[in-house]
């Protein structure tokens, strides 16, 4: 009977941020998750965000074969490496890169603020198993395109596809595609992404390029991350992160340079310190220094 009960987990992320323009304490995330198995090949998950109350995950997943699985509900879109592989408790930085935020539903140019999630269905799987992972992996799905807990505002469905190659343990190469129309006016929303990641042992190296069209606006950006696990509890990392909101205007570029330190002395506590310099190409916008400290309590 106990095996049928859901596993309960969660975390709280809170901290303080100072910049040239402001300073504030903040609560970034407060999440509670319930997950379990309904049957041997059928699992579920429900995750609730309390910082700004909403359901962020609610899905059923049927896993009959390694090569073919079905997921239905609300969950992370299978686009980019960071969106699905680097959840907040694994991520080396406090903030995600600009290109992911602006083009994949975090603080999207189309108006969505959905933490890279949507409601829909996807097929996914992997081929050529070796040492606990599949060398060739795919995801293909259809989604509302409206974000969290929102019914579709048009009759069109958005299509997302990703192909991931893992030639060796810790190494992955991924390409992603998103096509959609959002809102009652069927405005164009197209995204392309390509990236590579090596994360094994002490080494963390990762980079992605993401571009897209939102209505009539073309945008693009990319980031590069490098980190080194000095010990099992200490990880320093740096990131170069640049984004052109309007690809035709160089003055729309923002570039962030971030140095980060993550320290996790025990399983249930994670401490992060970030320094970011925000550089703006626009002549009338000054650069900005940002220092942020965030603590994660995990249960």
List where the protein language model places each region.
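Outer membrane beta-barrel
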Residues: 2-145, 155-157, 164-172, 225-228, ...
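Outer-membrane beta-barrel pore domains
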Residues: 18-21, 39, 45, 61-63, ...
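A generic structural motif
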Residues: 146-148, 213
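Active-site cleft segment of glycoside hydrolase catalytic domains centered on the general acid/base Glu
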Residues: 150-154
């Amino acid at each position: 009977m106990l095996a049928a009960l859901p596993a309960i987990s969660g975390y709280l992320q809170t901290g303080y941020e100072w910049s040239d323009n402001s300073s504030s304490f903040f609560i970034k995330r407060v999440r509670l998750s319930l997950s379990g198995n309904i049957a041997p090949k059928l699992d579920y998950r429900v995750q609730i965000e309390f910082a700004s109350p909403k359901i962020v995950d609610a899905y059923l997943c049927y896993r009959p074969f390694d090569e073919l699985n079905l997921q239905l509900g609300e969950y992370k879109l299978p686009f980019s490496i960071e969106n699905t592989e680097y959840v907040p408790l694994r991520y080396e930085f406090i903030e995600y890169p600009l290109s992911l935020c602006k083009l994949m539903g975090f603080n999207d140019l189309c108006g969505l603020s959905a933490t890279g999630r949507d409601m829909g269905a996807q097929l996914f799987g992997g081929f050529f198993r070796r040492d606990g992972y599949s060398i060739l992996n795919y995801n293909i799905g259809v989604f509302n395109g409206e974000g969290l807990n929102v019914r579709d505002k048009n009759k069109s469905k958005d299509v997302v596809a990703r192909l991931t190659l893992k030639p060796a343990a810790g190494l992955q190469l991924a390409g992603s595609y998103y096509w959609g129309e959002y809102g009652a006016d069927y405005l164009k929303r197209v995204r392309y992404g390509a990236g590579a990641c090596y994360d094994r042992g002490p080494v963390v190296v990762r980079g992605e390029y993401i571009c897209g069209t939102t209505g009539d606006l073309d945008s693009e950006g990319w980031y590069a991350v490098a980190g080194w696990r000095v010990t099992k509890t200490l990880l320093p990392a740096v990131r170069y992160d640049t984004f052109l909101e309007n690809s035709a205007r160089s003055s729309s570029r923002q570039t962030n340079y971030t140095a980060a330190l993550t320290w996790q002395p025990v399983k249930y506590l994670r401490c992060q310190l970030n320094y970011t310099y925000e550089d703006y190409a626009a002549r009338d916008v000054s650069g900005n220094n940002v220092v942020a400290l965030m603590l994660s309590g995990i249960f």
